[in-house]
From Swiss-Prot:
Belongs to the G-protein coupled receptor 1 family. Residues 1-51, 108-124, 187-216, 290-304 are extracellular. This is Neuropeptide Y receptor type 2. The keyword Kinase does not apply. Keywords: Cell membrane, Disulfide bond, G-protein coupled receptor, Glycoprotein, Lipoprotein, Membrane, Palmitate, Receptor, Transducer, Transmembrane, Transmembrane helix. Glycans are attached at N11. It comes from Mus musculus. GO terms for cellular component: cilium; glutamatergic synapse; non-motile cilium; plasma membrane; presynapse. Residues 73-86, 146-165, 238-268, 326-381 are cytoplasmic. InterPro entries: GPCR_Rhodpsn (IPR000276), GPCR_Rhodpsn_7TM (IPR017452), NPY2_rcpt (IPR001358), NPY_rcpt (IPR000611). PROSITE patterns: G_PROTEIN_RECEP_F1_1 (PS00237), G_PROTEIN_RECEP_F1_2 (PS50262). It holds the Pfam family 7tm_1. One of its GO terms (biological process) is outflow tract morphogenesis. Its main location: membrane.
Length: 381
C-alpha cells in the first residue's frame, strides 16, 4: 500500500475532503491544474465564428442601408419616379431600412455578448421593431403583386391613385403595428441564474397564464401563417397569372420587339421575387416551427448558432429587395446613376416608347377599341 494506507487502520473510514482548484489556483505542489473541459461549448463564442458573424451582419447592414436609402432617395427626388408602384417599393425600402438600422446591430451585439446589455427599453423595442418591419415588408410585397396583377391581367387603365396608395401604406403599418404588439407587450427583462452565483441579463418572451408555452406557440404558428404561407400563396398566384399573361400576349406594331424583351425581363424579375422571398425566410420559419412542435430542439448543442445562421439568411432579403425591385428595372438604373451624378432632373427612360404607344392607341381605339395601350403602360414601372 501507499503511504496513506500504511498510516490508516484497515477498518477505519478515512474521510478525504477534496478542494477544487480553479483557474489561477495552485495545487499543494505549486502546479497549475488544467482547465476543466466544458460540457457544452457555444460556437458563437469562438473568435473565428464571431468574425464571420460580424462580417455577415455588417455586410447586410451596409448593403441594406445603401440600397434602401438609394431607392427612397430617387423616388422622393425625381418626379417621374413618383408612381404608385414606386411608392410601394419605397415603403418596402423603409421597412427594410428599419431592420438594417435598428434591429440588426442590436441582434449582432446580443449574439456576440451572450446576454442583453442594452437595457429594458430596447428589450421591448427591438423585437417589436423587427416584427413590425417584417410584417410591413410582407404586406407591401403582397400589395405590389396584387397591384401588378390588377393592372396587367385585367388591362385596367385607371390605376390606384396616389392618395389611395398612401392610405394602403398607412393601413399596412397600422395592421403590422397591431399584429406585432405581442412582441413588445409579452417581453421580460430579467436576470437568469445559469449556475450558482452566476447570472446573466436576458430579454425573453413572457406569456401570461399557466400554460405560457401554449400562447407562445399559438402566436408563432399564427405569425407563420400570416407572414409566410398566406402571402407566399397570394404572391405566387398573382405572379403566375402575370407571367402567363405576359407570355401569351402579342404586341402589334413596330415596338413589339421592345416589349417582347421587356416581357422576358419582367418575368425573370417576378420569378426572382417569389424565389428570394420563399428561400430566404424558409429556413428560419421551418426552424421556429420545429421549436414549437418539439421544445427539445432548444436543447440542441448548436441551437444558438443554427438560429443565427438562419436569421442571417432571412435578413439577406433586406438588401436583395432593392436589387430585385430597383436595379433590375431600367428606370431605377437610370435614376441611380442620376443620383450619383447629382443631377436634378430625370427624363423618363421610356418616354419615346410611351409616346409611340399613345399615338398607336388613338388609332387602335378608332379601329377596334383594343386594350393594347393599357397593357403596355401596365408593364412600365
Amino acid at each position: 500500500m501507499g503511504p496513506v494506507g500504511a498510516e490508516a487502520d484497515e477498518n477505519q473510514t478515512v474521510e478525504v475532503k477534496v478542494e477544487p482548484y480553479g483557474p489561477g489556483h495552485t495545487t499543494p505542489r505549486g502546479e497549475l491544474p488544467p482547465d476543466p473541459e466544458p460540457e457544452l461549448i457555444d460556437s458563437t463564442k469562438l473568435v473565428e465564428v464571431q468574425v464571420i458573424l460580424i462580417l455577415a451582419y455588417c455586410s447586410i447592414i451596409l448593403l441594406g442601408v445603401v440600397g434602401n436609402s438609394l431607392v427612397i432617395h430617387v423616388v422622393i427626388k425625381f418626379k417621374s419616379m413618383r408612381t404608385v408602384t414606386n411608392f410601394f417599393i419605397a415603403n418596402l425600402a423603409v421597412a427594410d431600412l428599419l431592420v438594417n438600422t435598428l434591429c440588426l446591430p442590436f441582434t449582432l451585439t446580443y449574439t456576440l455578448m451572450g446576454e442583453w446589455k442594452m437595457g429594458p427599453v430596447l428589450c421591448h423595442l427591438v423585437p417589436y421593431a423587427q416584427g413590425l418591419a417584417v410584417q410591413v415588408s410582407t404586406i407591401t410585397l403582397t400589395v405590389i403583386a396584387l397591384d401588378r396583377h390588377r393592372c396587367i391581367v385585367y388591362h385596367l387603365e385607371s390605376k390606384i391613385s396616389k392618395r389611395i396608395s398612401f392610405l394602403i401604406i398607412g393601413l399596412a403599418w397600422g395592421i403590422s403595428a397591431l399584429l406585432a404588439s405581442p412582441l413588445a407587450i409579452f417581453r421580460e427583462y430579467s436576470l437568469i441564474e445559469i449556475i450558482p452565483d452566476f447570472e446573466i441579463v436576458a430579454c425573453t418572451e413572457k406569456w401570461p397564464g399557466e400554460e405560457k408555452s401554449v400562447y407562445g406557440t399559438v402566436y408563432s404558428l399564427s405569425t407563420l401563417l400570416i407572414l409566410y404561407v398566406l402571402p407566399l400563396g397570394i404572391i405566387s398566384f398573382s405572379y403566375t397569372r402575370i407571367w402567363s399573361k405576359l407570355r401569351n400576349h402579342v404586341s402589334p406594331g413596330a415596338a413589339s420587339d421592345h416589349y417582347h424583351q421587356r416581357r422576358h425581363k419582367m418575368t425573370k424579375m417576378l420569378v426572382c421575387v417569389v424565389v428570394v422571398f420563399a428561400v430566404s425566410w424558409l429556413p428560419l420559419h421551418a426552424f421556429q416551427l420545429a421549436v414549437d412542435i418539439d421544445s427539445h430542439v432548444l436543447d440542441l448543442k448548436e441551437y444558438k448558432l443554427i438560429f443565427t445562421v438562419f436569421h442571417i439568411i432571412a435578413m439577406c432579403s433586406t438588401f436583395a429587395n432593392p436589387l430585385l425591385y430597383g436595379w433590375m428595372n431600367s428606370n431605377y438604373r437610370k435614376a441611380f446613376l442620376s443620383a450619383f451624378r447629382c443631377e436634378q432632373r430625370l427624363d423618363a427612360i421610356h418616354s419615346e416608347v410611351s409616346m409611340t404607344f399613345k399615338a398607336k392607341k388613338n388609332l387602335e381605339v378608332k379601329k377596334n377599341n383594343g386594350p393594347t395601350d393599357s397593357f403596355s403602360e401596365a408593364t412600365n414601372v
